[in-house]
C-alpha cells in the first residue's frame, strides 16, 4: 500500500510539472480579436453659422455610418454614403450641382466632418457663403 501511495503521488507531481506550464500558457494567451470584413466608416457631420468651426456653435449634428450598410441619424444615409464612395472619400472633390442659383447674401455656414472613412482618420472643415451654396454641394452629404 505504501508503494502504491508513493507511486500515485509521484505520478501526480510529474503530471503537474509537465502539464502545469501548458495550462498556464493557454490561460495567459489572449484570444485574437476577430478581423472585420469592413474597414470602419463612421462620421459625425455638423453645421453652424460662422466663418470657422472655432467661432461657430453647431446648430445641427448627424452621424453617418457607411459600412457594412448605410445608417445613422443623417436624413439620407444611403445617398450620402454613395456620394462619398463616388469621390473615394475625398470630400473636397464634391462639386456644386449644375443649374443651382443662389443669392449673393453673405451669411457664412461652416460644415465639419470628423471620424473615420474606410479605416482612415478624417477631419474636414469648409465654410460656404450661405445655406443655399452649402446645399448645392454633394447632392445629399451636406443636406441635413
UniProtKB/Swiss-Prot annotation:
Disulfide bonds join 66-81, 102-132. Residues 1-34 form the signal peptide. One of its GO terms (molecular function) is serine-type endopeptidase inhibitor activity. Homodimer. The record marks 104-105 as: Reactive bond. Inhibitory activity against trypsin. It is found in: Secreted. Its main location: secreted. It comes from the Bacteria. Pfam families: SSI (PF00720). PROSITE patterns: SSI (PS00999). This is Trypsin inhibitor STI2. GO terms for cellular component: extracellular region. Keywords: Disulfide bond, Protease inhibitor, Secreted, Serine protease inhibitor, Signal. Belongs to the protease inhibitor I16 (SSI) family. It comes from Streptomyces longisporus.
Amino acid at each position: 500500500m505504501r508503494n502504491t501511495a508513493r507511486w500515485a503521488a509521484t505520478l501526480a507531481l510529474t503530471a503537474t510539472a509537465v502539464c502545469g506550464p501548458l495550462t498556464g500558457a493557454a490561460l495567459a494567451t489572449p484570444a485574437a480579436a476577430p478581423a472585420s470584413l469592413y474597414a470602419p466608416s463612421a462620421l459625425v457631420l455638423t453645421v453652424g453659422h460662422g466663418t470657422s468651426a472655432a467661432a461657430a456653435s453647431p446648430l445641427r449634428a448627424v452621424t453617418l455610418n457607411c459600412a457594412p450598410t448605410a445608417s445613422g441619424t443623417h436624413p439620407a444615409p444611403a445617398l450620402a454614403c454613395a456620394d462619398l464612395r463616388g469621390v473615394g472619400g475625398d470630400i473636397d472633390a464634391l462639386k456644386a450641382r449644375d443649374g443651382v442659383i443662389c443669392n449673393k447674401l453673405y451669411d457664412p455656414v461652416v460644415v465639419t466632418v470628423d471620424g473615420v472613412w474606410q479605416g482612415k482618420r478624417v477631419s474636414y472643415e469648409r465654410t460656404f457663403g450661405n445655406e443655399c451654396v452649402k446645399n448645392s454641394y454633394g447632392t445629399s452629404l451636406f443636406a441635413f
